[in-house]
Amino acid sequence: MWKIPRDFFSFFKKTSARVNIFPRSAPALLTRTGKKSYDDICAGTAGREKGFCIMKEKLSARDYVSVASMLFGLFFGAGNLIFPVHMGQMAGANLWPAIAGFCITGVGLPLLGVAALGLSRSSGLFDLSSKVGRPYAYFFTCLLYLTIGPFFAIPRCANTSFTVGLEQILPQDGNMKLWLFLFTLAFFIAALLFSLYPGKILTWVGKILNPLFLLFLGILVAVSLLNPTAHMSQVAPQGDYVSQPFFTGFLDGYNTMDALASLAFGIIVVQVIRGLGVEEPGAVARCTAKSGVFSCLLMAVIYLAVAVVGVQSRGVLETSENGGIALAQIARYYLGTPGLLVLAATVTLACLKTAIGLITSCAETFAAIFPHGPKYSAWAVIFSGVSLLFANFGLSAIIQYSIPVLMFLYPLAIMLPLLALCGKLFGHDRRVYGWTLGFTLAAALLDALFALPAGMQSLFHAGAIQKVVLRILPFSGLGLGWICPALVGLCIGLALHFCGKKPA
């Protein structure tokens, strides 16, 4: 999913736009310049004018390709493929509106987050969310990192590896939970060791792994498309995909968590673009958007192809409990046991690399925003232990319990970059941020409540509350009840900005 360099979080602190460390995730760009820092590049061919680089308005074609490749590598990962394949099995004949909704949240919103970081000149997520207030910045930053870290995304990496690989070749007896524990224990010991003692082997694995995985995926997709077991029109949609395919796909795109990741790690891309000489915020945002067109199109094509494979598998396979099982069953059907083993090994290594990056980045973040708390190594051990605990609940449980949290976080992760992109219109007035996100947060809490598992809903009397909310709040039946409250909060904030007393 996300490749996070350990030295990235030097950007996280409030520094000038010209930081002296480049992310390791852009080695090609550094190799081209032969430099190690932004200042070194500025002192080179461009020269200096009163301590600043001569700024460019746009990148060269070669630079656009480099940044686009970086964006693709930052957001695309093996773990995300379990969602479009399962969506394909569920959506059936209604795949087209479903994949359109999925791509908006799974592809478009991550690009929005990166562009917002570039346009607002923020030095990272904490700086961006501080526009609301420091207490909110601590709350939102911690919750977001815990979500894409030890609570859900990291355990999901281990579980996806187990579900696609070892679970498919082990005897289906009563010892599966023991095997899951042993596998996840080994997985997180390896992830922790690499997080504490990173080496060049990860860079080498990444360079080999991504092309290998894409090649294998291309073979699987090609074989499946050329030998469909069912045509799309013959596959009946299931669940909410029957009546609301677009909005159901839109909400299923939350599961990729890439919009959250864009706010956490998008500053990497922004700093690389600035390092190439594009400094004006609007130009940075434009360059990000242009670079993102290629990466977004590629991700959308991959998601679509995998979703179609999911649909066409329904001729011989039942709808699976989760996408990890579906992907493994499809690989076994078309490519046999050898193909399944190759898929399992590739996915396991890819997910391990993702888990290492996430443990590293979460530990760096918490060590940075809580300087008087535990050190980096202690946070890494804590997050690895928590991830091990949650991983043993199983992949389906992790996905199920992540949904309410994502229903709460995503509206905030949508509105914050939108406000940052439009911030010039209201001078980035904190009142606009506060009122908008305050109303959004309150409504998102209701959406999260209604997305809880059935047993927990009865505990909080969610059914009775939902009946009232459905009558008074538009779009709440679609899981988008936050939209109107967000607009109300925005109107109040803008009214205070343009008509009220200016803040001191």
Where are these regions (language model features)?
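Membrane-interface loop-to-helix entry segments
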Residues: 196-224, 402-414, 433-443
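Membrane-water interface regions at transmembrane-helix termini and the short interhelical loops
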Residues: 119-127, 186-209, 275-278, 388-401, ...
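Hydrophobic alpha-helical segments and their helix-loop junctions in multi-pass secondary transporters
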Residues: 150, 154, 214-241, 259-260, ...
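A generic transmembrane alpha-helix motif of multi-pass inner-membrane proteins
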Residues: 227, 429-504
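Selective recognition of specific alpha-helical transmembrane segments in multi-pass small-molecule
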Residues: 104, 108, 112, 212-225, ...
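TM-loop-TM module centered on a large, flexible mid-protein loop between adjacent transmembrane helices
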Residues: 124-130, 302-352, 359, 368, ...
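Hydrophobic, small-residue-rich membrane helices and short re-entrant helix-turn-helix hairpins
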Residues: 197-208, 246, 269-298, 316-328, ...
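Hydrophobic, membrane-embedded alpha-helices of multi-pass small-molecule transporters
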Residues: 65-76, 146, 223-230, 239-306, ...
